[in-house]
Amino acid sequence: MKILQVNSSARNFANGVGSVSSQLAGELVARLRDGEPTASVVVRDLARTPHPVLDEAALQALFTPADQRTPAQAERVALDDALIAEIQAADVVVIAAPMFNFGITAQLKNWIDAIARAKVTFQYTANGPEGLLKGKRVHVVLTRGGVYRDQASDNQVPYLRQVLGFLGMTDVEFIYAERQGMGPEASAQGVAEAREQIAALLQLGTATA
């Protein structure tokens, strides 16, 4: 089993301090490896290594035939290629996704823009779009300052479900760690609830199925 962990917070997590979403995603990956000791793990930390935005220069590079690209264009496309290769190889994907201003982080959006490539991770057919990243189990660890689960103000879940599904990843589970900005006790309770959700997934055997 190959696991890809994507940390998308703007904050690092090290020595027990920093991004709660990255911490919980790491805990989930560790639990997955407990059940699959031979599993390999790739961690894509977008705080430590931010991915560049999809700007005009990047678009020009992508739409230039490979044999006609400048060295700078080839280097830019190679950055996206690396992310695509990681997600193509993964059997299980764990995404740490904190809520920033009611949505996903800029870091996660840049990652999505990099992996969404026509004729590579999705294609248009006579019957409509078809995602090409099929057969993957995806866990999204959501951290929020307040309470947004099942609320109209939760813009993360609908967007992520749509864009991941568009790319072929329809087996998606969301794990919620809310109330992170509501004081130490509420924050700790939110983390505890997320850990309970992780434990339940593992007990049911659906974390890797």
UniProtKB/Swiss-Prot annotation:
Pfam families: Flavodoxin_2 (PF02525). Its EC number is 1.6.5.-, 1.7.1.17. It is an enzyme of class 1 (oxidoreductase). GO terms for molecular function: electron transfer activity; FMN binding; oxidoreductase activity, acting on NAD(P)H as acceptor; oxidoreductase activity, acting on NAD(P)H, quinone or similar compound as acceptor. Keywords: Flavoprotein, FMN, NAD, Oxidoreductase. Belongs to the azoreductase type 1 family. This is FMN-dependent NADH:quinone oxidoreductase. It comes from Leptothrix cholodnii (strain ATCC 51168 / LMG 8142 / SP-6).
